[in-house]
């Protein structure tokens, strides 16, 4: 177990190592669609790459979610199997729509799994970005 400070330091080292290992400018928040972003996340049990649709207006959020969902088979071609939740609740209680891919059995606190996480991040985020670029006009 790590102290809070040790955990923060390891997280900082993890993200720095990822950036140095795979120096690339990702789309992330620069989608040109407000509150529509791609995210990386990792904790002590898993790593995730997600598409978060965070519009406050539920009608807009649901409309974007439905557009993505209508392209489900195409998205699978880009990222493989994925999970989805139209009403995903964040830790802060905010409701968003999320589509994500997950890799379990890895930990941000285990340096031996970092390379595996980095490769997962690159493969899946690249798939999400290619999907976005190919269908951007339709979204």
Which residues does each PLM region occupy?
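Charged, terminal alpha-helix-loop-beta segments
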Residues: 1-139
